[in-house]
């Protein structure tokens, strides 16, 4: 599960000039001591982006995960792209979130960047679930049009591939639009917001518990802070 989507994402990145960066060996591939879970990580240098990372976790029929986050350059105030897909084979359960994660929540910003995502949410009822969370504040770094699905095999096999492709196309279109339009958030403020995003995510992301269960607490904390959210280690200077 998700291998085809990973291939599609990789193809998209390459078509937009992406080049693989070296990932430290301890993060590039990690196998659990029990041998029942393997994690692979990729880091991309993509024109127009400060950082683009991808994680693929394979725990057999227990769990499959595909996660990717793309941070635009500081000179670009467009949203951060977030993809988080989980498949529980034994339970035949899909949990999927795809979102353009806004740096700010004001109307002018949302009007500039979210027409495409709004349209997708209207077109795919299966990804129109209400996203309630005891972990995240949905008004912080999630958009009101986050594509969220709690489904089964039908959604995983038939709907997810379609919406995944449309989602990526929509995000690339946003990149093109951002080049043609003037930014409303200054580069220094974008940098601060990216740091805040990483700090918030490193604290809230439930993946830490998941990784700890497979790879141990020490490795998981290092992976969270050094690979997933490295800006969480930075200080915010006003």
UniProtKB/Swiss-Prot annotation:
Q: Which domain of life is it from?
A: Bacteria
InterPro entries under this entry? DiHydbiliverdin_OxRdtase, Ferredoxin-dep_bilin_Rdtase
Determine if Oxidoreductase is one of this entry's keywords. yes
Q: Which biological process, per GO, is one annotated for this protein?
A: phytochromobilin biosynthetic process
Query: Recorded GO terms, molecular function?
Result: 15,16-dihydrobiliverdin:ferredoxin oxidoreductase activity; cobalt ion binding
Give the reaction(s) catalysed.
15,16-dihydrobiliverdin + oxidized 2[4Fe-4S]-[ferredoxin] = biliverdin IXalpha + reduced 2[4Fe-4S]-[ferredoxin] + 2 H(+)
UniProt keyword annotation of Oxidoreductase present: yes
Report the top EC class in one word: oxidoreductase
Q: Which UniProt keywords apply?
A: Oxidoreductase
Give EC number(s), comma-separated. 1.3.7.2
Family matches, as HAMAP family: PebA
Task: Give the protein's function.
Answer: Catalyzes the two-electron reduction of biliverdin IX-alpha at the C15 methine bridge.
Please give the family membership noted in the entry. Answer: Belongs to the HY2 family.
> What is this protein identified as?
15,16-dihydrobiliverdin:ferredoxin oxidoreductase
User: Which organism is this entry from?
Assistant: Prochlorococcus marinus (strain NATL2A)
